[in-house]
Each structure stands twice: as C-alpha cells, then as structure tokens.
Amino acid sequence: MGTTLYKIVEQPKLNGGYVRKRIAWNNETLRQDYGKDYIGSVPKYDGFCTVPEHVSYQPVIGKFLNLYEPIPHQPQEGDFPSVRSLVEHIFGEQYELGMDYLQLLYLQPIQKLPILLLVSEERNTGKSTFLNFLKALFQNNVTFNTNEDFRSQFNSDWAGKLLIVVDEVLLSRREDSERLKNLSTALSYKVEAKGKDRDEIAFFAKFVLCSNNEYLPVIIDAGETRYWVRKIDRLQSDDTDFLQ
C-alpha cells in the first residue's frame, strides 16, 4: 500500500470463527517467511478508499483498496419469523418504517438516516439483541462505541463504518449532543489517528443508541428532527439462541 506492507491475518473471535485483519508488515520479515522473490507477487495499490456497497461490492476501485468490508449474506425470498419478531418488538406500530430502515442500510448505505435511540428503564428488552443483530447482519461495518469514543480526538477506527452503535449511551453534555447531531448529517469528516496527519473522508455512518435512562440519555431540543426515539417494552419471552 503505497510504501507500506500489510499482512492479512485471521484473528480468532471469542464466539468461534475468525475475523480478517490487516496488520503492518516489513520487507525483511516477508523475505524471511516467503523468500526474496515473493515480494514481486504482492499486489500493489496507491492507497485506501472507503466505498460502501452491499449489492455490487468492489474490493478494489481503480488502484485503491476498499476498506469497506463485504458481507456474506445474500437476500432470499421467504419467511423470516425470528427477524420479523425482533423488528416488530423494537419498532412496534412503526414496523414498516423499521423494515424500510433496514432496507435502506442494505441498498442505500450512503443515505442519511435519523439517529435511532432505543430507551427503556426495564431490563431484558431486546435492545442489546437488536444491536448484536445489526452487527451479525453488517459484520465488520458495524462498530460498538463507548461514550468516551465520541469525545476522543482519535476516530480512525470508527469514521468509515456503516453503523456506530452504543449499548449504554449517556451524552448529557451539550457539546456531546451537538457533535452527535452534526455527525448525523455531515457529508465529510476529518479522520485522525495517532501519529498520522488528519485526512478528510466522506462520512456515511448512522448511529443507533441504547439507554436505560428514559429522560436524559442525550440532550434533544424541542422540534429536533434528527432523532428517532423508541421506548422499548420488556420481552415476553427470551430466545437466547436467536443470533445462532
């Protein structure tokens, strides 16, 4: 990549399986592992890009390697009782809007969408299950953030994701809420990593926030239209194998 070597590795996951990662490598180690002539066969790119697409995904665009990850799922016609049950529980009377939301994430990943805020003081409501479902659906294009991640100046690990989800949000400071609102409608954003120059990229991330605080998880002004708030009821039954 430019003048830097990367190695693709398969990192074991806690629940089984592996996740592909790209780690920095060097010429000397490459020669030791594969011989001096191997470097000539290594693919070369001018740089990275981030172009989200699920239907016609391209791993390489021109001479740039696409950092957006492909997802292995292919839509199929048929019944989907488990997913439908979860979406009905989360979105209730707005079920059709919830299905539209998921469809837009898949078909139009650069489309701006409202900040989805799921709140409930009760336990066992399925909020975390819904976040894990989104992660299972869109895989490495979903990242779990903490409240502190939004306040950090370093954002390179989440700025190029489709979905940024927070399992227990508490951004009750005015500056936190303003930053979140601005990000939800921003077309570009400056990425910053430790030891590297800032770089401006297209920003297409959507936010899904969960909270047990029904009254002030974030500051929402009267008339604000950038939030979609859903109060989630307790689950009537608990399917612990849903994501399997």
Please describe what each predicted stretch is:
Residues 1-93:
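N-terminal nucleic-acid engagement/recognition segments and initiation subdomains in replication
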Residues 54-163, 177, 228-231:
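P-loop NTPase catalytic core of nucleic-acid-dependent motor ATPases
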Residues 154-159, 192-210:
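AAA+/SF3 P-loop NTPase mechanochemical coupling elements
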Residues 159-162, 186, 203-206, 222-228:
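Short glycine-/polar-rich loops that comprise or flank the Walker A/P-loop
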Residues 167-169, 179:
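Walker B catalytic acidic pair
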Residues 172-177, 219-220:
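Conserved ATPase-coupling elements of RecA-like P-loop NTPase cores
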Residues 177-199:
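Conserved catalytic/switch belt of AAA+ P-loop NTPases
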Residues 218-237:
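A short helix-turn-beta junction within AAA+ P-loop NTPase domains corresponding to the substrate/partner-engaging
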